[in-house]
Amino acid sequence: MGSTICIDEKNINGDCYTIVSNPETNKIVLMVNTLRASQIVYLIRSNISQEALFAVSCVTRDMAPNYDWVARELFPNAYQVADKFHVVKNIIDQVQSVRIRYRQELLRKQRELEEASRKQPKLQPDPKIQQELKDLKKELSNGDTQLQLLQRSKGLLHKLPNEHTASQKLRARLLFRLFPDIKEAYKFSVALRKWYQRPMRNGTSITPSRHLLECKKKALLEIITNHLSSPCEEVKNIAHFIVKHIGEICNYFLGYKTNASAEALNQNLQRFISINYGTRNSDFFLYRIAVHFS
């Protein structure tokens, strides 16, 4: 089993598989076509000794609540780490939700204005409606309309500010000026992603410890405090998500553990599936996976 275990899920041909793996050997411990915690617990207990389960000291896992139950039930001596990449993905998804919300509002407004404009007499159109349509389709200083700006800003919201190109910096300034909720959500996400960076001392990474965890937890609470009552729903969602999982998130600083090996294993599985032209027979597919990856 090893002292560290990774729990992740993989979608294959529309079916969800739970994969329990050993990051030290990059081998699969269990791969089963279910997400139900009770079935996963039963299968692992049926095939692995209690001594091996008790020897596990760390479990890195997906954010799904069923995996929390699996980890607590099977590995009582292990601390849990919410995978860093899943946490960051959840945060970025909420930032993108703000962008999508604004875009949907503008599309609705444009549709309603165009419908109202068509109903106006051609010789005496309503100047207010025409002006609003004109403003909506007006080009900004970078050549984008507001709708194009929202559409083309998807990529820059995934990046940190120091990673933006010159055109992305200009687009970001326009985006944040016109859509303040996106600015708030993005700034919040950047602060959280910087919080996740390993602290350095004299050019080297500080050794993970319980003291470091407590310091980082205090810093995280300071970051999210002002956002718990934000008027932006997506920002509140991020803050409450962090509060709900703060223990598992901060446990990252006990050993800098992530699910990176599980994600790499998923990619190897995907390549294996592609090389073998998909998975037509599930039982035979699982047998071949066991031969190659366990």
How would you label these PLM feature ranges?
Residues 26-47, 53:
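Nucleic-acid-processing active sites and adjacent nucleic-acid-binding tracks
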Residues 13-16, 23-25, 33, 51-75, ...:
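Acidic/histidine-rich catalytic cores and adjacent linkers
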Residues 92-104:
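Short, surface-exposed amphipathic charged segments that create phosphate/polyanion-binding patches used
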Residues 11, 36-37, 64-66, 87-89:
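Conserved nucleotide-binding/hydrolysis micro-motifs of P-loop NTPases
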Residues 9, 84-87, 264:
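Conformational gate/switch positions in structured elements
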Residues 77-95:
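Inter-helix linker motif
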Residues 1-12:
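Two-metal-ion RNase H-like nuclease active-site motif
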Residues 4, 58, 79-82:
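Hydrophobic "anchor" residues on beta-strands that sit immediately upstream
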